[in-house]
Amino acid sequence: MNTQQLAKLRSIVPEMRRVRHIHFVGIGGAGMGGIAEVLANEGYQISGSDLAPNPVTQQLTSLGATIFFNHRPENVRDASVVVVSSAISADNPEIVAAHEARIPVIRRAEMLAELMRFRHGIAIAGTHGKTTTTAMVSSIYAEAGLDPTFVNGGLVKAAGVHARLGHSRYLIAEADESDASFLHLQPMVAIVTNIEADHMDTYHGDFENLKQTFINFLHNLPFYGRAVMCVDDPVIRELLPRVGRQTTTYGFSDDADVRVEDYQQIGPQGHFTLLRQGMPDLRVTLNAPGRHNALNATAAVAVATEEGIDDDAILRALESFQGTGRRFDFLGEFPLEPVNGKSGTAMLVDDYGHHPTEVDATIKAARAGWPDKNLVMLFQPHRYTRTRDLYDDFANVLTQVDALLMLDVYPAGETPIPGADSRSLCRTIRNRGKIDPILVSDPAQIATILAPVLTGNDLILVQGAGNVGKIARYLSEIKLKPQTQEEEQHG
């Protein structure tokens, strides 16, 4: 970015000129890193801290950010403001030091709100589908030549980044309800994909509180703004009369303003027709599998249509959509001869879904696109509280696969809860008599345990939000082949 462009950006909010150095605590998270990346490209001095390097910190370092792989008071020295992830506790030494030095400490959504303040903001909220829908909206606007800024919670594979600074008035951002901080945002357009009971600790276990928070988020829209909402979702249908803003509904339902018809999945692609009020029908080829992704695309089309984007640009963007990292992410197809001596191959797919609804959607997409495959899932439950609260739902969903390997619960900082662990969940599933799950206590043994399960016509789903994505990449690197001790030492 040249000096003239930077001066123009800085002039949007003159008071932000007082801010020179922005420090992020927990900078390696995708949501934090995306905002840091946009601000780095706007010319701000960026620093941050996290526990270990990852692709996000590597990208930020390449942009000139200073990253500390520790949490120490001196890391916030000279910072104008400290941005904190919701995963960071109040007693973090950097947070304590910032308060003592009277440095403002804000949550990531508050900084995102500043980026959005004088732009045309499009915020994507909902329990499931936010990241993919954000990527789809961004792809359509980019294809139409509108050069948007976007900040996403996952890797936008076509761009190779989580966030990008554009030079137009549009800012497209994932809005996170997990800590209710999306209430800081004041967009012009808001998508709500669905609403389910998740992150209930934030909402004191009260689902009505969660629903009202979504209403409050939508009422942050100006009176001339627009809420785009999935009418297939029963909670959204219930809340629609309480939304005091202009609305566009979408879904498979007959009464949707933008309606999906004739959905068919062939391999990794969805094919369907979109019916829009007062507009020509669109015959869509979507390069992403599953009815849930057809809904995500329909939300993106509804927003783009309202903006007057050309239909050809919409169709091109969806047909060439490259997806987002860890969302039905195809990692390869590998011959089994070196793995277990069998002929045939196994496909490897990595997916972030960690709620029963998301896992169910991934399984359905796999079954629809590859109905003859032996469906093998490696599942890592995420958080003891989620496993406890949705225990029966997990047990019901996970019995739909042909073979199940389960890792221990990824705690995400939580302490174990009796009966909400992987061993208990495996026992419950086994007692239902459909499949016999295998508990994998040592992730280093996963390839050895997986090999005899594979038949020669397999689709392996690596599923979860913890560190299971690293296991998926490892399995891809070794091409599923169990490693000898010597191979591991030279790997």
From Swiss-Prot:
Molecular function via GO: ATP binding; UDP-N-acetylmuramate-L-alanine ligase activity
Domain of life of the native organism: Bacteria
Organism expressing this protein natively: Salmonella arizonae (strain ATCC BAA-731 / CDC346-86 / RSK2980)
First and last residue of the signal peptide: none
GO cellular component: cytoplasm
Record's function text: Cell wall formation.
Location in or out of the cell: Cytoplasm
Protein name, per record: UDP-N-acetylmuramate--L-alanine ligase
Binding site for ATP: 126-132
Name of the top EC class for this enzyme: ligase
Main location as per UniProt: cytoplasm
Annotated family: Belongs to the MurCDEF family.
GO BP field: cell division; cell wall organization; peptidoglycan biosynthetic process; regulation of cell shape
TM spans (from-to): none
Organism placement in taxonomy: Bacteria, Pseudomonadati, Pseudomonadota, Gammaproteobacteria, Enterobacterales
Catalytic activity, as annotated: UDP-N-acetyl-alpha-D-muramate + L-alanine + ATP = UDP-N-acetyl-alpha-D-muramoyl-L-alanine + ADP + phosphate + H(+)
SUPFAM superfamilies: MurCD N-terminal domain (SSF51984), MurD-like peptide ligases, catalytic domain (SSF53623), MurD-like peptide ligases, peptide-binding domain (SSF53244)
